[in-house]
Amino acid sequence: MAYVDGFLLTVPARKLAVYRRISAKAGKVWKEHGALEYRECVGDDVNVKHGLPFPKRTKAKKGEVVVFSWIVYKSRAHRDRILPKIMQDKRLKMDPKDMPFDMKRMSYGGFKVIVDL
């Protein structure tokens, strides 16, 4: 069964183009190493009247946008096998200070797929 790494973070709107460039490069690396899908999505209709809106969930500050992303693998074993190779890929090496978002505020985790249509 497929396995998904999911991410929820905020990015200053003025740094979204930089984030997009970094993410496009990262996505190519993930796919080259075997990820099935790599998606980065920016919030568009997120201030809903029911539930807890993403901006509140992420404590988005003025001028920040919410980013929701995910990476799909064949299985958790597949993810666990390729992730160390991805983390060692020199194309992804960056000083955390140069990231266009606050990594301490990012939420992420691995998820078992329970419905796949």
Language model features with spans:
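Glycine-rich beta-strand-turn "strand-cap" elements at beta-sheet edges
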Residues: 31, 35-62, 88-117
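Generic detector of contiguous secondary-structure segments
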Residues: 18-31, 66-71
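Short amphipathic alpha-helices in soluble, non-transmembrane regions
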Residues: 20-26, 82-90
